[in-house]
Amino acid sequence: MDPSSKKVTGRLMLAVGGAVLGSLQFGYNTGVINAPQKVIEEFYNQTWNHRYGEPIPSTTLTTLWSLSVAIFSVGGMIGSFSVGLFVNRFGRRNSMLMMNLLAFVAAVLMGFSKLGKSFEMLILGRFIIGVYCGLTTGFVPMYVGEVSPTALRGALGTLHQLGIVVGILIAQVFGLDSIMGNADLWPLLLSVIFIPALLQCILLPFCPESPRFLLINRNEENRAKSVLKKLRGTADVTRDLQEMKEEGRQMMREKKVTILELFRSPAYRQPILIAVVLQLSQQLSGINAVFYYSTSIFEKAGVQQPVYATIGSGIVNTAFTVVSLFVVERAGRRTLHLIGLAGMAGCAVLMTIALALLERLPWMSYLSIVAIFGFVAFFEVGPGPIPWFIVAELFSQGPRPAAIAVAGFSNWTSNFIVGMCFQYVEQLCGPYVFIIFTVLLVLFFIFTYFKVPETKGRTFDEIASGFRQGGASQSDKTPEELFHPLGADSQV
């Protein structure tokens, strides 16, 4: 392998670092709304009282709060489905740059909602930042995947998930009552998102456009070559250019790929099914349910400040994403995803047993804590980071934007459904709710084992051609070559 293929240059890290600021925004806005719930609800009550001269009815308060939380996912669904509209017209980098306008508008609306005595401003701000985050979950993995050398694509792709979990952790810390999660500073807590947006606006103009976009979509070979030299830190980028040109020639032979075509064409049907199921394996794994349960479990275990224990789980979240970052190019995507799913299923069983026996055996709360940390750790080994960047790997340049839009929409929709339904299912099933997630995790494990190929070390065109052959004749590759057994390596 060419030594330059694993070289991490300053320009490459600037490009990836500038992009994943958007991932940090996604994580921050996912986690920020939980801590200040009580003080924001009190703001809703005061606003209602100021307008109508009476306290807000409890059902109205519950509805407004649920809307404040859920509207973020609705915005995300709309944003994720719109990815292709921007990246093909404006490019990957410019799309990320333009979308910061949404972050600034959202920051102003949420930051001044208390001053304006308007909960509508806060809810609208949550919707707008949701649209921004939906777009970001498409833009960032696509851009990072296209600027990264093949040998580093998995490791750098994991930085998207690292940005998300760091954002969640920052939100948990900033949301402490002693910092910004109080009646005076919660507007600042919600509007501080203007800082990473401003930083991204400063950095992105110095980042290169995706060389694949320049060559394949714009046919600007000289610019693509110049960008590649800076990204790779070498004057000889012939191999990269040839691989992109081959992908471009293949794209010219294909008709324009729409979202409907992804499901109609045999060449795309299997990879889009894999992309959607992997996104579902992330959101339907039960990770949100675990965070929902964590505070009450820590309280039962006698933890004086359960919020700090919840932050501890956020630190575990971050630490194991870093672990995944270093092993993804060695172990492979498929292997890590399988290990993560299996580990989560085991921890879900432990959690079910511990929660069911908690009243009779108080020490079971400690087993619950171990199971929670284990569940979070295994999530970040596989189902957390892998689904985001493997979608970009499964498709060539032509269908990639449409595929990422479909996958992102699936992720946000399932996130919304879990957020809306979990409370009711938990009331119905009690501690046995994790049996549902255990069954789902086992099903996702079986699907991954039999259907998901290892993409480590393969170029985009090699992966796509494997599916084309699989969908057509299987003449050049056997199923064993395309769908490696657990832990198999795919050398180019």
UniProtKB/Swiss-Prot annotation:
Catalytic reaction equation(s): D-glucose(out) = D-glucose(in)
Location relative to the cell: Cell membrane; Photoreceptor inner segment
Alphabetic keyword roster: Acetylation, Cell membrane, Glycoprotein, Membrane, Phosphoprotein, Sugar transport, Transmembrane, Transmembrane helix, Transport
Post-translational modification comment from the UniProt entry: Phosphorylation at Ser-226 by PKC promotes glucose uptake by increasing cell membrane localization.
Membrane topology classification: Multi-pass membrane protein
Cytoplasmic topological intervals: 1-11, 88-90, 145-155, 207-271, 329-334, 389-401, 451-492
Origin superkingdom: Eukaryota
Pfam family, one: Sugar_tr
Subunit structure: Found in a complex with ADD2, DMTN and SLC2A1. Interacts (via C-terminus cytoplasmic region) with DMTN isoform 2. Interacts with SNX27; the interaction is required when endocytosed to prevent degradation in lysosomes and promote recycling to the plasma membrane. Interacts with GIPC (via PDZ domain). Interacts with STOM. Interacts with SGTA (via Gln-rich region). Interacts with isoform 1 of BSG. Interacts with SMIM43; the interaction may promote SLC2A1-mediated glucose transport to meet the energy needs of mesendoderm differentiation.
Null allele phenotype: Early embryonic lethality.
Cellular component, GO annotation: apical plasma membrane; basolateral plasma membrane; caveola; cortical actin cytoskeleton; cytoplasm; cytosol; female germ cell nucleus; female pronucleus
Protein name, as recorded: Solute carrier family 2, facilitated glucose transporter member 1
Transmembrane segments annotated in the record for this chain: 12-33, 67-87, 91-112, 121-144, 156-176, 186-206, 272-293, 307-328, 335-355, 366-388, 402-422, 430-450
Taxonomic lineage of the native organism: Eukaryota, Metazoa, Chordata, Craniata, Vertebrata
Region Disordered, residue ranges: 468-492
Location of Phosphothreonine modifications: 478
Modified residues (Phosphoserine): 226, 465, 490
One GO MF term: kinase binding
Keyword Cell membrane among record annotations: yes
GO BP terms: cellular hyperosmotic response; cellular response to glucose starvation; cellular response to mechanical stimulus; cerebral cortex development; D-glucose import; D-glucose import across plasma membrane; D-glucose transmembrane transport; dehydroascorbic acid transport
Sites carrying sugar chains: 45
SUPFAM superfamilies documented for this protein: MFS general substrate transporter
Gene3D superfamilies, per database record: MFS general substrate transporter like domains
Role according to the record: Facilitative glucose transporter, which is responsible for constitutive or basal glucose uptake. Has a very broad substrate specificity; can transport a wide range of aldoses including both pentoses and hexoses. Most important energy carrier of the brain: present at the blood-brain barrier and assures the energy-independent, facilitative transport of glucose into the brain. In association with BSG and NXNL1, promotes retinal cone survival by increasing glucose uptake into photoreceptors. Required for mesendoderm differentiation.
Organism of provenance: Mus musculus (Mouse)
InterPro entries listed in its UniProt record: Glu_transpt_1 (IPR002439), GLUT (IPR045263), MFS_dom (IPR020846), MFS_sugar_transport-like (IPR005828), MFS_trans_sf (IPR036259), Sugar/inositol_transpt (IPR003663), Sugar_transporter_CS (IPR005829)
